[in-house]
Amino acid sequence: MNKVPLLEMRNITKSFGKFQALKGVDLTVFSGEIHALMGENGAGKSTLMKILAGAYTTTSGEILIEGRPWSIKGPKDALNAGISLIYQEMQLAPNLTVAENIFLGSELSRGGLVQRKEMVMQTQAVIDRLGAQFKASDLVMGLTIAEQQQVEIARALHRNSRILVMDEPTAALSTRETHRLFELILRLRDEGMAIIYISHRMAEVYELSDRVSVLRDGQYVGSLMRANLNANELVRMMVGRPLSDLFNKERDIPLGHLRLNVHHLTDGAKVQAVSLQVRSGEIVGLAGLVGAGRSELAQLIFGVRKATGGTIEIDGVPLVIHSPREAIRHGIGFLTENRKEQGLFLELAAQDNITMATLERDACYGLLDRKKARAISDDAINRLNIRVPHAQVRAGGLSGGNQQKLLISRWVAISPRILILDEPTRGVDVGAKSEIYRIMSQMAREGVAILMISSELPEVVGMSDRVYVMHEGRIAGELHHPDITQENIMTLATGVTEDHKKEVYHD
């Protein structure tokens, strides 16, 4: 690294009215460095980067580029400083070509005529440098999300940007697309670019970053070099407490009667003769690899998928559940895996999302009782600590953690007997995870039977009283404490037999 930082942000303060979003934040970034920026939602990461990109102006503080003070009052000042920011939501015109997007606002012209051929040639040269598969003449609307991201990066390279800010760039990418993006980021770093990488995903930070800086409550907490990265320390810096305190599972909750009894449940495709039980007050983990049939099993119980065999009993009563409406009537709640596509109504208010499952129960002669709906939503917002200014705020404008808690509150509102949670903390930061774990533990104490599907093994180990592991549509095994370990779960999830365990783990 060079001794003189490429970028210094010193004592940056930003206020919105009486609210102070940033309180004297410092950030130093060098050329040829991938610098991860971490923190809970609301910690100030996006605000700090919007100041750097010229979307916001500072209340106080200064920005230096290569040791020289640089005034950034708007996006043009940031571009002149060699700074580009790639937002989570792509800033592209879908009905224009790649070349037209690259040159948007700075079109090449001669004699009053736009030089389209030259623009295409220059754009294609940048695309080839990236190793992308699309062409400069392709319409952006026909590209994948990963390819659109490459267009954003190509635009930054065309502008000769030296500092590239990426805000949660893998949120909508597949595993393969993420791997390709990482290869590109590492190549850009090796070419001397400074990359500020905003993410809440520790695995990505461990794989990519040369250094990590953490913000908490609008303040700079500290930085760690790659050699010193430690999950416990990162969590402590982000939330003010160690990783061991993250899981809020109470082990002294007395278990009640058998609440959910699934026997030989089958759909003829993804789920084969699955049997499991969950007691009142119990959190049961359901682990397994992608494609093992976990989500499909949950959909069978909730009536989304049709069972071809097997039985479901709730509190000892055999039931045939044909639809989600019937499941809700029987006191079953289901947090879906993808909150944006299968759970939330993003354009509706928080209150409407919360009360969606109680409409049939609380309607009077087919009319919504608005006073009761408001009371239900206000109670849920307070109980789950959902950070919204009011109940009428649009759900799509909330952070990932608050969206997830909003969806959980929908099922809390029906006072469920059984709650199925499919990837309950996917896509949320550490602080929101801790809140969700607290909610789960509280509901278990109130007697709710919880079936938790999760691909995060520390979560399964930390929150489960028992664990079922699925492999190829069947239950491969059941684990009790102290045998609930990541190694034992993976052994069952991958179909490794007792005869091969020693070979796999100790070869």
Curated annotation (Swiss-Prot):
Q: What is this protein identified as? A: Ribose import ATP-binding protein RbsA
SUPFAM superfamilies on file: P-loop containing nucleoside triphosphate hydrolases (SSF52540)
How is this protein positioned relative to the membrane?
Answer: Peripheral membrane protein
Give the main localization category. membrane
Q: Which PROSITE patterns match?
A: ABC_TRANSPORTER_1, ABC_TRANSPORTER_2, RBSA
| Cellular component terms per the entry's GO annotation | plasma membrane
**Entry's Pfam families?**
ABC_tran
Q: Which residues form the ABC transporter domain?
A: 7-242, 253-497
Gene this protein is translated from: rbsA
Which compartments is it annotated to reside in? Cell inner membrane
List positions binding ATP. 39-46
InterPro entries from the entry? Answer: AAA+_ATPase, ABC_carbohydrate_import_ATPase, ABC_transporter-like_ATP-bd, ABC_transporter-like_CS, P-loop_NTPase
